[in-house]
């Protein structure tokens, strides 16, 4: 039976890899809806290839260009523009599963719309749970939908948990490559350029998540996501540096057994599993050869080099609206870094300033409006914080 899929964030890294899977397995999957940010040319090509019933472009001013680019298609898909258009695509029609590939908190509202429409979620947008976990998880339960992780680490944990009885999980071990600077001395980080930060040693990803990998904020955010997905306390979720990125994460069980999921670093594998679960689909992809992979090594993360990791743990433990503030501040400050308006070491300093300013206003049981308000406040506060960085001491370590 062919599974019907809607994909939001279709022109990004997650989106294009998802469409690679759909094109490789047309007897398994079909596309109902597509939504993208601003890339008219790529979205038009995707519409021509996959013939969705509906499509949207978030940059509303580019809707006329999209309409013109596919004016010869027959039949014409429904074409929408703006954030409201993306939300409509997420809830539209008979799609069984919605893949959330939008980067950042922009994916929250489309994900909620899809859940409320009764659609299963292949979650590749970790910010949905990090910022919106207190709202999203009750909606998942209310509407009886499945929330399937589609990023490598949480997919690995999910796969390892198949067959583990309730209460059997003791600890989660999230593996991290260490990012672009895993072999750099801390002192060299003051010299980091944007080009340096975008040289990930193992994975092919978008610009924002590649910078997050370099700061290890990506792994810190994944700790918060794991807390929401699997229900463990933060003290039972650990990060370990694994430079080869062959073991994608591990779980420790109550009897001290440890289970791991292994594979080449290829995002298509967790995406395929999220789409095909509970089935396993044969692929002709390269098989893992442990002899070829060679040594698998592990080390503790350097807290001095990666202060963002500890900022994420602190925000997660604070709970409430604090993770939303952390996430929004990180998104905004990484964008400033990519635009070369701040230095690499300014990233954790700025995030810490913004989170500190939110402590007295942290909302313990936030509504969706509270989360969205905290998100917007944090983005504005980043602009103030960056102006004050010169007067703040540099972070050396966070205990």
From Swiss-Prot:
SUPFAM superfamilies: 1-deoxy-D-xylulose-5-phosphate reductoisomerase, C-terminal domain, Glyceraldehyde-3-phosphate dehydrogenase-like, C-terminal domain, NAD(P)-binding Rossmann-fold domains. It catalyses: 2-C-methyl-D-erythritol 4-phosphate + NADP(+) = 1-deoxy-D-xylulose 5-phosphate + NADPH + H(+). NADPH binds at residues 11-14, 37, 39, 125, 127, 206. Keywords: Isoprene biosynthesis, Manganese, Metal-binding, NADP, Oxidoreductase. GO terms for molecular function: 1-deoxy-D-xylulose-5-phosphate reductoisomerase activity; manganese ion binding; NADPH binding. 1-deoxy-D-xylulose 5-phosphate binds at residues 126, 152-153, 177, 200, 213, 218-219, 222. It comes from the Bacteria. It holds the Pfam family DXPR_C. Its EC number is 1.1.1.267. It is an enzyme of class 1 (oxidoreductase). Its cofactor is Mg(2+); Mn(2+). One of its GO terms (biological process) is isopentenyl diphosphate biosynthetic process, methylerythritol 4-phosphate pathway involved in terpenoid biosynthetic process. Mn(2+) binds at residues 151, 153, 222. InterPro entries: DXP_reductoisomerase, DXP_reductoisomerase_C, DXP_reductoisomerase_N, DXPR_C, DXPR_C_sf, NAD(P)-bd_dom_sf. Pathway: Isoprenoid biosynthesis; isopentenyl diphosphate biosynthesis via DXP pathway; isopentenyl diphosphate from 1-deoxy-D-xylulose 5-phosphate: step 1/6. Belongs to the DXR family. HAMAP family: DXP_reductoisom (MF_00183). Catalyzes the NADPH-dependent rearrangement and reduction of 1-deoxy-D-xylulose-5-phosphate (DXP) to 2-C-methyl-D-erythritol 4-phosphate (MEP). This is 1-deoxy-D-xylulose 5-phosphate reductoisomerase. It comes from Nostoc sp. (strain PCC 7120 / SAG 25.82 / UTEX 2576). The gene is dxr.
């Amino acid at each position: 039976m062919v599974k019907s899929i809607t994909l939001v964030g279709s022109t990004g890294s997650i989106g294009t890899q998802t469409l690679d899977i759909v094109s490789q397995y047309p007897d398994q999957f079909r596309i109902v809806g597509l939504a993208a940010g601003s890339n008219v040319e790529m979205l038009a090509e995707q519409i021509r290839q996959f013939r969705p019933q509906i499509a949207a472009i978030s940059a509303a001013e580019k809707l006329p260009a999209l309409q013109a680019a596919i004016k010869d298609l027959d039949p014409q898909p429904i074409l929408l523009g703006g954030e409201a258009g993306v939300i409509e695509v997420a809830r539209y029609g008979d799609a069984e599963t919605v893949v959330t590939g939008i980067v950042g908190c922009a994916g929250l509202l489309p994900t909620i719309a899809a859940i409320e429409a009764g659609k299963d979620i292949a979650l590749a947008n970790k910010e949905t749970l990090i910022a919106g976990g207190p709202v999203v998880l009750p909606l998942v339960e209310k509407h009886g939908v499945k929330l399937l992780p589609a990023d490598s680490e949480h997919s690995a944990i999910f796969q390892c948990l198949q067959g583990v009885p309730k209460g059997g999980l003791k600890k989660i071990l999230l593996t991290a490559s260490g990012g672009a600077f895993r072999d750099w001395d801390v002192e060299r980080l003051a010299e980091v350029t944007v080009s340096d930060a975008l040289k990930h040693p193992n994975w092919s990803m978008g610009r924002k998540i590649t910078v997050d990998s370099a700061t290890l904020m990506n792994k810190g955010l994944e700790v918060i996501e794991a807390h929401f997905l699997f229900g463990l306390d933060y003290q039972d979720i650990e990060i370990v540096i694994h430079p080869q990125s062959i073991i994608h994460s591990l779980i420790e069980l109550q009897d001290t057994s440890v289970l791991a999921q292994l594979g080449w670093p290829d995002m298509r594998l967790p995406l395929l599993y999220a789409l095909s679960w509970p089935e396993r689909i044969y692929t002709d992809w390269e098989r893992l050869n442990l002899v070829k992979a060679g040594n698998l090594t592990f080390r503790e993360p350097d807290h001095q080099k990666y202060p963002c990791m500890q900022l994420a743990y602190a925000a997660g433990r604070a709970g409430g609206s604090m993770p939303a503030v952390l996430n929004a501040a990180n998104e905004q400050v990484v964008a400033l870094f990519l635009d070369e308006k701040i230095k690499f070491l300014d990233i954790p300093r700025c995030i810490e300033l913004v989170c500190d300013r939110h402590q007295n206003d942290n909302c313990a049981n936030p509504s969706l409006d509270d989360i969205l308000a905290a998100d917007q406040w944090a983005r504005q506060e980043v602009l103030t914080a960056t102006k004050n960085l010169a007067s703040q001491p540099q972070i050396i370590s966070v205990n």
